[in-house]
From Swiss-Prot:
PANTHER family: NEDD4-BINDING PROTEIN 2. Keywords: Nucleus. GO terms for cellular component: cytoplasm; nucleolus; nucleus. The keyword Nucleus applies. This is Smr domain-containing protein C1235.03.
Length: 502
């Protein structure tokens, strides 16, 4: 029952989404019903693609016409020349760059533009960034000044009453360590803001971790919800798979020991997790922020969680997914040394992994309707499914290549090949065989034997390879005999070739 489903999936996946084809094939009881549905959908998708193509062409032509019209209007406008302001300037400035900056930032003074351009050594991009920052600072200062004016005008009489002096607690004169001073800065801005919802807090934390660790937010989303929304375990797993940890040398590791020791002493976390966080963040303050997040969420959400090498086991479904992913990572690296059977087996395993990831993506997408954070997890699973699909195609291609080089110079076994693959292989092998035998006498030619099988593994137990190869050899004007799942090629059928030319 699986053979016709696999054949339909392989054929219609070229025109439709593979997940949709898989769902229709699995829901159908017989091949005819599934084929009718898929054929109708494929025809409809092809018609839609053609209409969409023509719509895109019309839209592109209209946009091009609009751009041409806009360019003509812009070219008619005379640009103002500011280069006369450089006559009395002692700075060596590029007139073209200055003219562009002056026209773009007309609200700024000429002296300010000249100083910024000289500071940036006539670099247009750097100068533009500097002037944009200056404009933003000016606007923020104006907003703060207006706000202060409103607040000052509303101050009451009681605010000017004399306050009693209170003695401040005398602090010890012991100098603050680097960690203590940075801890105060982190504590001023709480990691989990009580005024925000849980969803907003998690979104802000994911954005912060993305900027620090340079990890895609979809991957952090997936890891966070895979570990039951526990930040300590999530951060540990992300740090464990982070790229810099695998490239660190012993000399570089020694540089982080002093700061990591201080972090471990003051946070109470293990030296290993402090060192790993410091290496991955590559900044003391960022590492401190991540460790404070671990400490705070460990206390508030998870209790006394210890970040050790042995974490709590996930549920049985998570274990199954992990085992399959580990199995895919341990697949044979030497692709060229694999046989056709091994390549087909690996292709089937990758297809199973692809289907599992597409199923997980669909589940996460349905969950994202109630919680938007699951949208990133759905995208992550869909990306994994596409990667597994590409690997399955790769090993399928390797299987065809291995099959093409199998057998002897005068024989070929096509078991395990599809009709399309078999046609390509037969043409190559028969041409190579005839290149060697063409110069010999007709009585000395050694025939070429092609084994196609009797169709015992085909849908409906009907042979597919044999009729397809027979039609191919007839079209290419070969002389052959076909019987009992085997084709024997003797040479070129010259009479058939002459008749076709006539």
């Amino acid at each position: 029952m699986q053979d016709w489903r696999a054949a339909l999936e392989e054929y219609y996946s070229r025109y439709l989404d593979s997940a949709l084809v898989l769902a229709i094939v699995n829901d159908s009881d017989d091949s005819n019903t599934a084929r009718e549905i898929l054929e109708a959908l494929s025809i409809e998708s092809q018609c839609d693609s053609h209409e969409e193509h023509w719509d895109n062409l019309r839209r592109d032509e209209q946009e091009l016409l609009n751009l041409k019209t806009l360019d003509e209007e812009i070219n008619k406008i005379d640009e103002e020349d500011f280069t006369w302001e450089l006559k009395d300037s002692s700075l060596e400035l590029d007139p073209d760059v200055y003219n562009f900056l002056r026209s773009m930032f007309s609200d700024l003074s000429a002296a300010r533009v000249q100083l910024v351009q000289a500071k940036c050594q006539n670099d247009l991009v750097r100068s533009s960034d500097e002037l944009l920052n200056h404009r933003a600072i000016q606007e923020s200062e104006q907003i703060e000044t207006a706000a202060d004016a409103l607040i000052t005008s509303n101050i009451g009489h009681r605010s000017r009453q004399r306050k009693k002096k209170t003695k401040k607690a005398t602090n010890s004169r012991k100098p603050l360590s680097k960690f203590q001073s940075n801890t105060e800065e982190v504590n001023e801005d709480p990691i989990l803001k009580p005024s925000l919802s849980v969803w907003e807090n998690n979104r802000l934390l994911i954005e912060k971790l993305t900027s620090i660790l340079n990890i895609p937010s979809s991957q952090i989303n997936h890891e966070f919800y895979k570990n039951s929304s526990a930040w300590p375990i999530t951060i540990r797993n992300l740090i464990h798979r982070h790229q810099p940890l695998s490239n660190i040398t012993n000399n570089e590791l020694m540089k982080y020991q002093e700061e990591a020791t201080q972090l471990a002493k003051d946070t109470g976390l293990s030296l290993k997790i402090c060192t790993d966080v410091l290496i991955c963040s590559n900044d003391y303050k960022n590492a401190l922020w991540i460790l404070c997040l671990i400490k705070e969420t460990q206390h508030n959400e998870m209790g006394n969680i210890k970040l050790s090498s042995q974490t709590a086991k996930s549920n049985s479904s998570t274990q199954t997914k992990t085992c399959l992913n580990d199995q895919s990572s341990k697949l044979v690296e030497d692709d060229e040394a694999l046989s056709a059977e091994d390549c087909n087996r690996l292709a089937e395993e990758y297809l199973e992994l692809r289907n599992m990831q597409y199923s997980n993506s669909a589940k996460e997408y349905r969950r994202s309707k109630s919680n938007h954070l699951f949208g990133g997890s759905a995208m992550y699973h869909a990306q994994l499914g596409r990667e597994y699909h590409e690997k399955a195609l790769k090993y399928r291609s390797l299987a065809m290549r291995s099959l093409a080089h199998s057998g002897t110079s005068h024989s070929l076994d096509l078991h395990g090949a599809t009709v399309r693959e078999a046609k390509t292989i037969v043409r190559e092998r028969v041409a190579a065989w005839w290149a060697k035998e063409a110069d010999t006498s007709p009585n000395s030619i050694r025939p070429f034997v092609i084994v196609t099988g009797r169709g015992n593994h085909s849908i409906g137990l009907e042979a597919r390879l044999l009729p397809a190869i027979v039609r191919l050899l007839q079209q290419d004007h070969w002389r052959f005999d076909a019987e009992h799942g085997q084709i024997t090629v003797y040479g070129i059928n010259r009479h058939s070739k002459l008749n076709s030319n006539a």
